[in-house]
Amino acid sequence: MNILLNGIAQELRDGAVVAELLMVAGLAEKRVAVEVNLDIVPRSRHATHVLCAGDRVEIVHAIGGG
């Protein structure tokens, strides 16, 4: 299936979950925020949130500061 990841087409297996996408993108151990179709997906749901063809996914890195 195809999704859009930060505006770029990305191919994943059917039934892939957010955690798999993060692994493919090399971000599995990073502090990131994930948004799917304008809804934030909490880290606690990364392993269970199933992606669908055509989903628009945005991933942003958490940056500390003050």
Predicted features along the sequence, with ranges:
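Ubiquitin-like/PB1-type beta-grasp interaction modules and other compact soluble beta-rich domains
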Residues: 1-65
